[in-house]
Amino acid sequence: GFLYKDNIYFSHYATAWQIFKDYPVAGVGLKNFRAYCSDPAYLDKVYPGYRNINCTTHPHNLYYEILSELGILGAIIFFSFFVYFFYICLKRSYEQSNMFLYGNTLFLMTYFIPFLPRGSFFTNWNAIIFWTIFTISFYLLNKKETHA
């Protein structure tokens, strides 16, 4: 359809998928998508209309970024950590009636909505926002209640 052929992000997704297929276990390393996407081998593997726009600093999608740069092993560790973190945060926010922790957790979870184009998870202003709120949530999760 028109969304696939006219959307520049699909060129990045296709390239990231090809990189993942070539390096499925451990990926190419954090922030190395930019080094591999310009390889001529990937130009031949993507949709012909994307051959001149397939390379950028990151794939613009969290899942493709993690798979291409960290591979299956890294993706399992990465996503397991966040699933566990979100579970603990939601559980504690319910037990303590902490709406601030609950809201922060829901906000952080929106970063994991599939198929949304995003900046790099590790290196841009989106990352600054995510990691700042993550740190606040982590603090709230470990904060000891003080009684006056």
Name what the model sees in each region.
Residues 42, 89-97, 121, 145:
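Membrane-interfacial segments
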Residues 69-112:
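Hydrophobic transmembrane alpha-helices and their immediate junctions
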Residues 15, 36, 62, 66-72, ...:
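Generic recognition of well-ordered alpha-helical segments
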Residues 20:
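Conserved short C-terminal alpha-helix that flanks the catalytic cleft of nucleotide-sugar-dependent
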Residues 104-148:
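Transmembrane alpha-helices of multi-pass inner-membrane enzymes
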Residues 30-32, 74-77, 122:
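Short, flexible micro-motifs
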Residues 2-14, 26-70:
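Long extracytoplasmic/lumenal interhelical loops at the membrane interface
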